[in-house]
Amino acid sequence: VPEPNYGDQLQPKGIPGVKAEASPRLRYQEVSGQFADGEQYTLLKPELYFDELNYGELHKDVQTSVRVAPVMIGLGLLEAIPEADILQQADPDDSNGDGISGRPNRVWDVLKQETVPGRFGWKANQPTVRQQSEGAFHGDLGITTTLFPEQGCTAAQQDCLNAPDGGKPEISAEIMEKVTFYASTLAVPARRDMDDADVKQGELLFNRAGCTSCHTAEFTTGSSTDFPELAGQVIRPYTDLLLHDMGEGLADG
């Protein structure tokens, strides 16, 4: 649910006549503990707070978390993974008792007007490369698109609502097609040092520790109407495209 005054994404930058929403800040809390073998550790836990809230206070129940830009390579290959192959790995109740309880994130596909499994974003909150790209133009840059034609201004932001815009949409469908093509076909770099002894040992330990229970090592892409060159490829993305409960220390809403 969007925050009433600030929406669902905080904007720390403004334009002439429109103030930035706020200035996000980080401070760190020292957290101590010990591993199961008794070894002591000290970690720095980041805490997010905000200065210069220009459109009122945040709602008392607001949930906040930080994000960095995701990697852009191989997105079309991830979109070409058959939905059935993703759902086959879901085990939300850990029925097989392996300690892994991945589940798909069901999200709204604006183009199809239906709920589908998400694939993109840090929490699989976008279903397609196109919607992820248009969402970035809209949410990150404030540029309206075919899928998101309305400005992201809240009722509290009259300066934003009154500001001139570049039309509806501000970015054409033709340009978005080119952006989607680029984002979908940007190649994955070739694997490096695969015969190095340390790399082989790391791969062995990765598998032995059970990391591939979540970080699925291999998929075969299905058909791709838009980009047939992506079809039928064996890929190694090391993701299952599912959501996992990482525990209280890593959960951020």
Residue ranges and their predicted role:
Residues 1-253:
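Periplasmic c-type cytochrome electron-transfer domains
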